[in-house]
């Protein structure tokens, strides 16, 4: 176990250039390449990238469908977006469409609740 700790200490004291040279020497000795290791680590890195995505700061509120109460949903869309009657009606009838983009989480949740109360199905992306 003391040998492993010595190896860890020695590796920790290497400069970046020395570590790169060590990597090349080990690649040659073991007959492997760092590119293969990166390809294998790629999916694991993708999983790690998904975690920060959960902490998004900007959301898009998407109207999935208007539901049964289309007129109520149109009224809410107008109130939320400031669109005219025709534009709001076109947006609601063309669902799924984004209602508001680039909003923070609190505002997105508030908009979602408003639209769902009116009878719409809403997604946050």
From Swiss-Prot:
Stated role: Forms part of the ribosomal stalk which helps the ribosome interact with GTP-bound translation factors. Is thus essential for accurate translation.
**Gene Ontology terms, cellular component aspect?**
cytosolic large ribosomal subunit
Q: What is this protein called?
A: Large ribosomal subunit protein bL12
**By its UniProt entry, which SUPFAM superfamilies does this protein fall under?**
ClpS-like (SSF54736), Ribosomal protein L7/12, oligomerisation (N-terminal) domain (SSF48300)
Query: What family does the entry list?
Result: Belongs to the bacterial ribosomal protein bL12 family.
Record note on quaternary structure:
Homodimer. Part of the ribosomal stalk of the 50S ribosomal subunit. Forms a multimeric L10(L12)X complex, where L10 forms an elongated spine to which 2 to 4 L12 dimers bind in a sequential fashion. Binds GTP-bound translation factors.
CDD domains of this UniProt entry?
Answer: Ribosomal_L7_L12
Q: Any idea which GO molecular function terms this record carries?
A: mRNA binding; structural constituent of ribosome
Record carries keyword Lipid biosynthesis: no
Keywords for this protein: Ribonucleoprotein, Ribosomal protein
Example GO BP: translation
């Amino acid at each position: 176990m003391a040998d492993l700790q010595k190896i860890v200490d020695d590796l920790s004291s290497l400069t970046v250039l020395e570590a790169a040279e060590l990597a090349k020497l080990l690649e040659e000795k073991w007959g492997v390449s760092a590119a293969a290791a990166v390809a294998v680590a790629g999916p694991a890195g993708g999983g790690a990238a998904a975690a920060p995505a959960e902490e998004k700061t900007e959301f898009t509120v998407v109207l999935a469908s208007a539901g049964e109460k289309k007129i109520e949903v149109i009224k809410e869309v107008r109130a939320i977006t400031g669109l005219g009657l025709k534009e709001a009606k076109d947006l609601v009838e063309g669902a799924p469409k984004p209602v508001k983009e680039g909003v923070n989480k609190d505002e997105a949740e508030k908009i979602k609740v408003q639209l769902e109360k009116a009878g719409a199905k809403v997604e946050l992306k």
